[in-house]
């Protein structure tokens, strides 16, 4: 596969994470897009988040690939309908909270992932700070 083809394939894996898992709640897809050593950890983070914010919607703002790394900038929105970080559901909505994810792709799956998010903005919008 050409270098450009590999980069597009790597970006498609992150797109699947956003569209099929985070936006559509497809937890069963986690094993397809995460390496076996990371799949359970991803599920253990994503599942409770989606339970707390079942209408989660992530927008891809930027998606950049180089080598085996994909970096994404996202805007995330959702309604707080379940316990999150020890806080009871508020029923309030957060909108367009900035997030950045860095993903290392190995053998067509996410092998490592790091993320940063504007948690304070999310908490402010939910009335939790």
Where are the predicted features?
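C-terminal and inter-domain tail/linker signature
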Residues: 1-129
């Amino acid at each position: 596969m050409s270098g450009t083809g590999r980069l597009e394939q790597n970006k498609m894996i992150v797109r699947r994470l956003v569209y099929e898992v985070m936006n559509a709640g497809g937890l069963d897809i986690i094993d397809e897009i995460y390496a076996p050593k990371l799949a359970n950890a991803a599920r253990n983070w994503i599942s409770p988040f989606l339970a707390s914010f079942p209408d989660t919607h992530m927008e891809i703002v930027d998606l950049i690939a180089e080598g085996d790394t994909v970096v994404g900038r996202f805007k995330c929105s959702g309604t707080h309908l379940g316990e999150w970080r020890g806080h009871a559901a508020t029923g309030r909505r957060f909108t367009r909270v900035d997030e950045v994810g860095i993903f290392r792709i190995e053998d067509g799956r996410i092998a490592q992932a790091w993320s940063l998010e504007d948690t304070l903005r999310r908490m402010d919008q939910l009335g939790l700070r």
